[in-house]
Amino acid sequence: MLAIPIIGFLVFTLYPMLWAIRLSWFYYTGVPSETHYVGWANFASVLKSKPFWQVFANTVLFAVMKMPIELTLALTIAVFVSGKRKGSGFFRTMYFMPYIISVAIVGVVFSNMFGYFGIINGLLVKLGILGEPLNWFAGKMSAMWMIVIASIWQTFGLNVLYFVSALNNVPRELYE
């Protein structure tokens, strides 16, 4: 019964991972005759490169921006939908739905919503909040916020699920 998943794991996860780790110690162009051992040189060149540190800083910034908002939002929603309330099953389904959508689809949806001619700009201009459409993706920080918002929208449902499970396991005597 477990043979098929284990074989799948070995073939599609473990073997490629070990092969990539092995290749990281070699100079490799895809041509076997040009491959030679370089040891720590690949790692040293990565740690010396500016793009690596820029990506690292962006990743830390993304996490610092996303996690407090996502966890606060997820806990707040979990408190409201935990327990046996009428309609809570519907809401649990609705907040979890974005989690099963592909990241690429989420990117397309948000780029269309927040694009220069997107629905958000159109709505804000019609309501008189903006005089002209905003280019949400033009600046570094505004683009980062758009990515954070899209990521929160997609993934907070799983955190809500975790919080609801935890809250439903709290004994009723502990509530005031």
Residue map of PLM features:
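A structural signal for multi-pass alpha-helical bundles of membrane permease subunits
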Residues: M1-E176
